[in-house]
Amino acid sequence: MTIGLYFGTQTGKTETVCGYIKEEFGDSVADAIDVSKKDLADFPNFDGLICGIPTWNTGAEELRSGTAWDELLEDIPDLDLKGKPVALFGLGDSVGYGEDFVDAMEELHRYFEKAGAKMVGYVSLDGYENFTSSRCLIPHLNEITKPEEGMKFCGLPVDEDSEGELTEERVKNWCTQLKLEMGL
């Protein structure tokens, strides 16, 4: 089984997190690919996908990443990803932009669901105390929602700006979860 690893970035931080993921998965995960240098045609060729997206403070209701993902979102539902496991991670700043923490991750989630993907890798809110609201909280996706007990993020939130010291451990724990959920 080979998992595709894709990311969009403006600062390089999303690519750095891909490096941590690759360390955890080894050869089960392909080398990370920047979506600005590749089209989506290869997505269905993988047994599953892990995709990373930053949330950039664009002030927009849509196209929140400020990366190549924004131009590719509407093409995702045209892919045949029925039943393929897809996990997402998003970068954001829970202190500086705590009112829209990792919002762009919700956009990817929505479009991959439309393609029939089996979404995996949901993460508990435990340990994420700094943010005030997010659009990527389950069960209220795409609504600006304040965190409540029992909710989950629709992927792994990563805060390299305010909680960078927690990133590697969060990624390691998430990858352990993904290996089970993806059958690796």
PLM features per residue range, with description:
Residues E24, S28, N45-L184:
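FMN-binding flavodoxin-like domain, especially the glycine-rich phosphate-binding loop
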Residues S28-D39:
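A short beta-strand-loop structural module common to alpha/beta enzyme folds
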